[in-house]
Amino acid sequence: MASGKVEKMASIDAQLRLLAPKKVSEDDKLVEYDALLLDRFLDILESLHGSGIRETVQELYEHAAEYERTHDTKKLEELGNLITSLDAGDSIVIAKSFSQMLNLANLAEEVQLAYRRRIKKTKKGDFADESSAITESDFEETLRRLVDLKKSPEEIFATLKNQTVDLVLTAHPTQSVRRSLLQKHGRIRDCLSQLYAKDISPDDKQELDEALQRAIQAAFRTDEIRRVQPTPQDEMRMGMSYFHETIWKGVPKFLRRVDTALKNIGINERVPYNVPLIQFSSWMGGDRDGNPRVTPEVTRDVVLLARMMAANMYFTQITDLMFELSMWRCNDEVRARAQELHSQSKSDAKHYIEFWKQIPLSEPYRVILGDVRDKLYNTREHAHKLLANGSSDVPEESTFTHIDQFLEPLELCYKSLCASGDQPIADGSLLDFMRQVSTFGLSLVKLDIRQESDRHTEVMDAITTHLGIGSYRSWSEEKRQEWLLSELRGKRPLFGSDLPMSYEVADAIGTFRVLAELPNDSFGAYIISMATAPSDVLAVELLQRECGIKKPLRVVPLFEKLADLQSAAASMTRLFSIDWYKNRINGTQEVMIGYSDSGKDAGRLSAAWQLYKVQEQLIQVAKEYGVKLTMFHGRGGTVGRGGGPTHLALLSQPPDTIHGSLRVTIQGEVIEQSFGEEHLCFRTLERYTAATLEHGIDPPTSPKPEWRALMDEMAVITTKEYRSVVLQEPRFVEYFRSATPELEYGRMNIGSRPAKRKPGGGIETLRAIPWIFSWTQTRFHLPVWLGCGAAFKHVIEKDIKNLAMLKDMYNQWSFFRVTIDLLEMVFAKGDPGIAALYDKLLVKDELKPFGENLRKSYLEAQKFLLEIAGHKDPLDADPYLKQILRLRDPYTTTLNVFQVYTLKRIRDPSFHVTVRPHLSKEMDANSLAADLVKLNPTSEYPPGLEDTLILTMKGIAAGMQNTG
């Protein structure tokens, strides 16, 4: 390495060490990883754009790092002066550079997280962030802990065999990084991991370093900005890419680890292959709530695409299995089946690469698997032709139409191998394959359908109006129930082709007809958002029957807003008391609770407590009626939308509310963090399985009555304070839209769904995602903390003994600890100084006191929270996360300053800036700017501003790791 390069590298390392001077564990290599990636990136930047750009990037970084050390707001203004003097081309290059550096920092963290040993001495329960997952047990530790609690291995195994975790990948991919970049990020992560492996040869190291530089340059040269809004089909393909990359192979690998962990506590038996500990569902192409782009045709497309992908993934594996199972010894059943298939096989299969000639009877397993291969090939072709042409000439009898048809020959081979003394062989690739079949079926994922209750009301209103019996919409709840039940008990058809239909009604009915047409095993639940009453559920049951769905989907009400959560138990009581409905559900019911809209409606603390209570109430109602209830947690990736670390968030749920059956959303913005890399995928599967098992066998204790009373009191104050600002202050919407990039959010083309449920209107019409996203961008996180400070202050000033009680709650009650620690993590990521800069530049003078008061509330809430947690500064008890944030902050701060000054220039054309000479080393000073303008020829703003703004949004989202 040349001396100049050594000096640059040492300089970068020194700067990072100023921010994070101490290692947090023996195996802490985060600063080394960061320094290597940053050094390679800056070298690439210099080679592409010259030393002037590199020096400016480093100068901006140093100003931002100085601000992070001193919090002197003059440094922000100095940053602003440097940034506004850049010309359009340089501005985009430098904003893109900081966004890239944040992505690289995240990749360094993922590598560190995937490989570091656990820090044993960290204080128990410090679980502020997913990435601090020190207290998140691996599966083997969970089993050992349960055995230490005097739970027998047999009890643990029996409980495990009866549990299922269904992970639901959501349709609105708030994942703001393009798939093209995610793949390049994967290569960077792999190279970095291998570079630090033991016993790496000098040649390997050099080649890996070159590969790393190629991947970094390829990522930097890829346009970060989606120029076209993704369709629901695009979203689905992106979600499914994780199955290709990690999940497909990750599931059998994880289940094998479960077997090993069980063996280590004395269970000499494997988890049965047909026990699906993990299942996967999706909303991609099924979630039509507020998204007019999800049509019946889209739903049909994504179902057929998923079936084609599933058949293809099985097909690509079956040849390896045929190579492995070359044995001749078998039982009589396998021999007879092989002879039968052999006699039916007429000709060679020239479209196969391996085993294309007729397989001899001396290889019976291969004969049987050859028939499985033929059917998989035909299954794939059948789905492909239906998808491409709308029809298929592949005979259905030559395909797999049901999972039992697929599993049966595999089971036959498995049992024969075991009976022939070859169980070790049976428990190899064949067992892995059977576990994949049990987990993924023929559909890869089960598609949930989600629609808002009002759309079903429109359909029913069209029907009753056409029948001449009045307007369903104007009927009371009692009259609606009476009519729906009379129709459900009867058999007459409700409507025919002469039913007058609006576009919305036709779309809703078209969805039910697609459900009737497609294979039933492709679908999961039919979820009704904004559910408020039993008639919402009965209407969907009736529409399923009317449209000819032979095996109706289970109907799941989703309770979201505070008032709906409060009345959820009463609604389910009324439903369970209806004989027709009780017979229909056959003793099982699923209810979904929404974290996003409840938080937007009432504030995070109130929503969290109401969600806790509603689960207790619903479980009690279900017990009274002899119904097994599954809770479906609609958690967002961000704290404002119910996000947080998996293991402890689940363990903080009320006792008896999981019961071995759990559904939970994996939101778009955390899919990459959960499944983007092999080790991350493994940890995700491990966390959910371990937490569900632990909650079932060793449930958390219930809160004391006095704790409940205090929470009730604080929830009332929180909601009152939150709503007094967000919903009742007449100029709040004006302030919100001035002080955040909410108005510009739609330009990001993040997902296929509109940002609003309805055009116009205030905060109540805004979806929870852009609401959270906008405040995350300004580092103010208002929806998470607003109201908390007022609640803490009220109860402590009312009686100082309440402070001691709050401290007891924090130390003894997992729900309260999780809630407080998540708040603390948000305060660690927040910065009221940055938020003040947005106000200074973007908000009218008469609205500025609004922001000043909110920042006082922020600091007050933080003060009380730290007092309750017994910490001097945020994250005192979590050095690992504190280190991560310190290393990340200078990048994020630079992007914040970029963003606020760009917003100022967009919104205020009279804002004057003096542009200095072009820095980038292009042949022509205007060529880079011209090229970048060509990427966005329709922008209504001066050259470079719109792209710079979007790049800052993406970068800050990467820095916060909560895009909304």
Swiss-Prot record:
Main location: cytoplasm
Swiss-Prot/TrEMBL GO biological process terms: carbon fixation; leaf development; photosynthesis; tricarboxylic acid cycle
InterPro entries reported for this sequence: PEP_COase, PEP_COase_bac/pln-type, PEP_COase_Lys_AS, PEPCASE_His_AS, Pyrv/PenolPyrv_kinase-like_dom
Species: Amaranthus hypochondriacus
Activity: how regulated: By light-reversible phosphorylation.
GO molecular function, one term: phosphoenolpyruvate carboxylase activity
Subunit structure: Homotetramer.
EC number(s) stated in the UniProt entry for this protein: 4.1.1.31
Top-level taxon in the UniProt lineage: Eukaryota
Record's subcellular location: Cytoplasm
Name assigned to this protein: Phosphoenolpyruvate carboxylase
Its job: Through the carboxylation of phosphoenolpyruvate (PEP) it forms oxaloacetate, a four-carbon dicarboxylic acid source for the tricarboxylic acid cycle.
Phosphoserine PTM sites in chain numbering: S11
Residues annotated as the enzyme's active site: H172, K600
Catalyzed reactions: oxaloacetate + phosphate = phosphoenolpyruvate + hydrogencarbonate
